[in-house]
Amino acid sequence: MKAYQRHFIELALAKNVLKFGEFTLKSGRVSPYFFNAGLFNTGRDLALLGQFYAQTLIDNHVPCDVLFGPAYKGIPIATTTAVALVEHHDMDVPYCFNRKEAKDHGEGGTLVGSPLTGNVVIVDDVITAGTAIRESMEIIKQHDATLSGVLLSLDRQEKGRGSLSAIQELERDYQCQVYSIITLDDLISYLTESETLSAHLPAVKAYRERYGIN
């Protein structure tokens, strides 16, 4: 695990974004951990988050001409990632986001920011059903741009109703690559090394065994 991935987990724990216990998910599954990226809610949190996303983009050599943040959670992520790329990597990347409702005055339309052209990277927090990401992919297609990847904070590596995860279904349906700052396997590695949190390891491993993708 890289230093920034460890730092991301530590920030998530400090902000209660990542918690351990028993949590009933929308799917009805009882998960031994819960991740709520909405609790990254200060300027410092966003600044660090942008650095983590930017580093993940760089490490995976993802071609990127425009960052796209799906409304609403993806908007601050796209913004802070763009800032981190220029401040820490000298990459001045435009960003764009969509409105939930079209605007019929002023500049109008459903998109705000840069035009969607070239290689577009979608940035969001996590994928559950993947609805917002699929909508974003259709928007990119309508503008004749190319989807070069999707960037997330956490990949739960968890099956949906079938044998694939929501991420794997997106990769299959849109022939795209999904990247994440950390995966559940990274979290398991962190727990294995942690003196204070290792008690949660058996439950997380059992959950991975039961619901995890191969």
From Swiss-Prot:
EC number: 2.4.2.10
Binding site for 5-phospho-alpha-D-ribose 1-diphosphate: 26, 72-73, 99-100, 103, 105, 124-132
Co-factor requirement: Mg(2+)
Residues noted as binding orotate in the record, renumbered to the chain: F34, F35, T128, R156
Protein keywords: Glycosyltransferase, Magnesium, Pyrimidine biosynthesis, Transferase
Enzyme class, first EC level, given as a word: transferase
UniProt subunit comment: Homodimer.
Family the entry assigns: Belongs to the purine/pyrimidine phosphoribosyltransferase family. PyrE subfamily.
Name this polypeptide is given: Orotate phosphoribosyltransferase
Organism expressing this protein natively: Proteus mirabilis (strain HI4320)
Gene: pyrE
